[in-house]
Amino acid sequence: MQHSSAGSEERITSSTSSPRSGHKTASSLFGLLSKRPSKVEPHPVTPESPRLQQRPVSACGQYDVSFAKCNADTSANHVNNNGSTLKSQTLPLEKSHSGLISFHRRAKPSSSKGKNHSHRHSTDAGSQSDGGADVVMRRKSPKHRSPNHNRFSHQFSLCCKAEKKPMTPPVTVRYNSIPDSNSVLRRDNLSLSWSMVDNNSGSLHSSEGSSHRPRPSSECASAPESPVASKTFFAHCSPAAASASVARSESLQNRSPIRPMAVSACRSRLRLKLYPPGQELPPLQAATEPGDIKRATTPQHMSSPNIATQPDGIEHIEEQPGVRFMSHENMTLQRQGSGSNLARQTLMAAHALNLIPADNARERSYLDGRLGSTSLLGPSELSRVLPQKEITVFVGTWNMNGHSPPKQLNDFVLPANVEHVPDIVVMGTQESTPDRFEWEVTIQETLGPSHVLFHATTLGTLHLAVYMRRDLIWYCSVPEDASMSVRTGSAFRTKGAVAISFCLFGTSMLFVTSHLTAHQQKVKERVSDVKRIINALDLPRNLPNQRHKNKDVTQNFDNVFWCGDLNFRLGEPREKLLEWIQNTKFPLPSHLPHGYMHTDQLTSVLADGAAFRGFMEANITFPPTYKYDPGSQNFDTSSKQRAPAYTDRILYKYRQMQGLVIRRQTLVPGVSTPTQPHVQCLLYDSVPSITTSDHKPVWALFRTLIRAGTDAIPLAAGLFSRDIYLEGMRRRLNNQYSGASAVCVLQ
C-alpha cells in the first residue's frame, strides 16, 4: 500500500454533458475524502462482469448503481471510452473493509443511438439546473476533519462515478433496505433527495417512503442513525455485523421516533412543540378510516419523523387537562370546547324556560292550596328556582342625621367583601332625608337592573325599603307594613318603628327598623320602647292560619330582622374609650372577646331577657359608630362631648320550622353534630368611609333557609315600584358615561 505525502496531489475529474455549457465548475462534492490515503482501482463496468451487482432502475431513477471491490495495491490508470486517461483517486482503505460504489448509465444498444456515452469518475452528479460540468480539483493536502464531523471515515473507502441526462429532475435514491448475502436488513422508510451538494458538506432532505423494494446482496450496510452528522452512508460489514444491525433496527422501532440531534434541531423543536412534553409520539401509520385526515407530505430532514403522516393525537391531548402549548389541534379543541359550552348554556336556558305541556294547563287540582296540577309555591317549583333552598339577605341601618346621602353608595350597598349581590336587600334609615324618592332611586341605581323595589314604608323620619331580585317577586305574598311611634303627641315623629312583612314561598319574614329613646342613662325607657313596639305592630293581617296569632309580633314569623339606632351605650368614661380605640387595631378578631362589650347596655339586656327575647347578634369587630363630627373621622369634639358607643345595631331571630331539619354529617360515630341554623350571620361590619352623618352605617349579611309553601296566600304577582326602577336605570345609564370626555384624544 502506498501512502501519499502531505504535498501529494489528488485529482478528481467529473464530467457530464450539458446543453448550456460544456465546461463548468461543479457546484458540490459527492465523495468523502479520508485521512488515510490508499490508491483505488475502479472495477471496469461491463455487462460481462460476473462480480458486478446492480440496483434496479426504479430505486435509483436515471442511475444504475454498481458495487465492486477496491484493490489497494493497484495503481494503474484507467482509460474511459473516449480514450482519455484518468488518474486513480486516493481514498482511505482498511485492511478488512473495502468497497466501491460505481454509478453508471445503463449501456444503450449502438443501433438505437449512435452517441458515445463516456464513463468518467465523478464526485458530483451535477446540479439540478446546469447538469454538471468537467472539473479538475487539486488538493495540496488532505482536509482535516474532526472525529465528530466524520467519525466513520476511517472505516470506508468510496469510489463513485455517475452520469446524468441534461435538464433532468433531481435523482432520488431510496435506502429503504440494503440486504446482505445472509440476512435482509430493513430500515425505516426514508428517501434521500440529493440537492445542491457542495464541496464542504452534503445537504440532505428526507421524506417518507411507503414501499420496501428487494435489493441484491452487496457489501454495503445501511445508513447510520445520523447521516448528516457522520456523512457516511455505506460500510462493508460481515454477516455477524448485519445481524447486530438488524437487532439495533428492531430496538430503534420501539424507541420514540424523536431523536435529539444537534443538526436537525430546528425540525425536532418544531415537532416537539406539536406534542406535550414527556409524551411519546404515536406510531406511524397511514390513515385507513374514512374520517381520517390526509395531509400533503413535504420533504423534511431524515432525522425527524414526517409530521404529515402522524395521527392527530387529539385523544391524548384531551386526557391532559393542563396542556400549555398552542397548536392547530389545541385551537381546534378550544373551539370545540367553546361550542360545547354554548350547547350547555343552551340546555340550561331551555331548562330554565322549559316547555309547558298543554295538558298540565288544562288540569285542575282539587287539593287545597294548589292552583293547578303543580303548586306555584310547592316543592317542585322551589327546587327549580332555588336548588339550594336558601337565599342571602342584606340588612343595613344608618342614621342619616337629616343630610343627603353621598352620590356613591357602593361601600354601603355593595361592600367589597361581599362576593355576590344578595337576593334581598333591606335598608332601614333614621333621621332620613326628606326626599324619600331620591333616596330610593339612589339605592336602585346602585343595585342595578337585577333588583327591584318590592315595598317601602315610612313614618316621620323613619324609612324602610325592601329590594328583591326580579325573579323572586313572583313567589312572594302581598307585602304588609305597620308602624308605631313612641312619642304620640309630638309633631315630628323621630322615635318609633316601622315594619314590613311578607312570605317567600313558605317562609315568612319580618323586617323592623326603629329609633329608640336617646341618652346614656335612659336604659329603662329604651326597654319600654321595645316592648311597646313588639306589642303594637299588628302583623300579619292577611295571611291564612293566623287564628292563634301571638301578641308578640316576633313570634308570628319564621325569620325576624331588627335594625336601627337603638341608642344603647357603653358604660365607660369617654377618655377611657378614646384611649382604647386609639390603641386598638380594627377589625378585631371575631373569636376573641371584645374589650368593653361587657359594659354594653344592649348586651346586658339580651343576656337578662328584659327585651328582645330570643334575638341574637353577631360578634362586633368594628369600632363604635357614634358619635363623629360630620365630614371627618374624629369622634365628637363639640360641647356635648358624647362618648363613643355602638348605637347602630342589627339583631335577628328565627324559629324552628318543620321540614327544614338539615343535619350536618356526623364526624364522630355515635355523636351527632348540631343542626344547621336556619338563619346564619355571615358578615357584620360598619362603613367608616361615609362621613356625611354623625353615625356610621352598619350592615350585616345573612343566609336563611327557605321552605315550600301553598298557593292559598295572597300573591304579589310580580308587584314592584316601576317608577323607581325606570328612574334608577335611566340614571345608571347616564352616569355610565358621565366621566368620559367628549373630545377624542389621538396619541
From Swiss-Prot:
GO CC terms: ciliary base; cytoplasm; membrane
Matches recorded under Gene3D superfamilies: Endonuclease/exonuclease/phosphatase
Location relative to the cell: Cell projection, Cilium
Knockout consequences: Viable and fertile, however flies display a decrease in extracellular sound-evoked potentials. This hearing defect is likely due to the increased levels of phosphatidylinositol 4,5-bisphosphate (PtdIns 4,5-P2) in the ciliary base that results in the abnormal localization of membrane proteins such as ktub, iav and nompC.
Segments of skewed composition (Basic residues): 106-120
Coiled-coil zones: none
One Pfam family it belongs to: Exo_endo_phos2
Enzyme Commission identifier(s): 3.1.3.36
Family designation: Belongs to the inositol 1,4,5-trisphosphate 5-phosphatase type IV family.
Role played: Converts phosphatidylinositol 3,4,5-trisphosphate (PtdIns 3,4,5-P3) to PtdIns-P2, and phosphatidylinositol 4,5-bisphosphate (PtdIns 4,5-P2) to phosphatidylinositol 4-phosphate (PI-4-P). By controlling the phosphoinositide composition of the cilia membrane of auditory receptor neurons, regulates the cilia localization of ktub and consequently the transient receptor potential channels iav and nompC.
Protein name (record): Inositol polyphosphate 5-phosphatase E
Organism for this UniProt entry: Drosophila melanogaster (Fruit fly)
